[in-house]
Amino acid sequence: MAQSKMPRRPAMLDAARADAIVGDEDPAATAAVAHTAAWALMGVGDETFTDADVARLRETVRTSGVDTIAHVWSRSPEFTLPGALWRVYLLHEWYHRDPLLVAERYADGSRAPIIQGLEAPVELRPLSLIMEEVDSLLRGDLTDDDLEYVLGEASRAMRVLAAGEAGALWIEDPADPLAHRVTMRHSALLVTADELDVAAREAAVGTLD
């Protein structure tokens, strides 16, 4: 792995406040908690969120699942780490809920003559391998050094999914548990792929907030 980059982000809250603030309506506080959880999942703490706090959060995620913290990312902008992780989380949840559907759409897209955003010839990896890497990221098994690669691979997968006959639509039913402004917007898969590409580039140079 490359030498770890020092991320640029808002000041983290202390561990007790991060645990207690779920559901807080204060946007600044919610954003701070989202950043705390996201960077801690990557193994990054600071003077107020110690290595022990980080280890405890990662262990909680590994034993109880990323759902325990993911919801605090749902309002985060796409150009931030929590925003990028939220988008990857939505892909993760979709894949694990509907594995056959997602696999079929990926296979369909892989046969498309043109995959928007990918230059021909396109060498595609099995979707299962990409999702294993996404799972590792969301379990806290990876670090911020892995962000560029995993976010980029998630973006490529979304471009392939959008290339088939079903197009770039993602979630259409507003009653779907995965219905969100990210998943229900026009050309949702492609727009999200673009956002993840930007986040990957920012991660590569250590400027992902």
Language model feature labels by segment:
Residues M1-L85, Y89-E93:
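N-terminal domain-start signal
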Residues H71, R87, H96-D209:
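A contiguous, surface-oriented mixed alpha/beta subdomain in the mid-to-C-terminal portion of proteins
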